[in-house]
Amino acid sequence: MDIEYELIETYGVFDETESGWTREVNLISWNGREPKIDVRTWSPDHSKSAKIGTLSKDAARKLGQILVRITE
């Protein structure tokens, strides 16, 4: 089963790996459903993604700043 997604808006990137994958906060519609705030790691071309398991303190701080900004 293919999973379809539409990236509606990028709120911010809060971390990047040496291989170029980025940890991002986005507004995404999955399989045509209502868009939701989504936090995950993306490949440079956004063709692959992975859920986030752990964060450094610096990445957590940046994530917190993005979440505060988009919910104000």
Task: Show where each model-derived region lies.
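Positively charged, low-complexity terminal tracts
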Residues: M1-E72
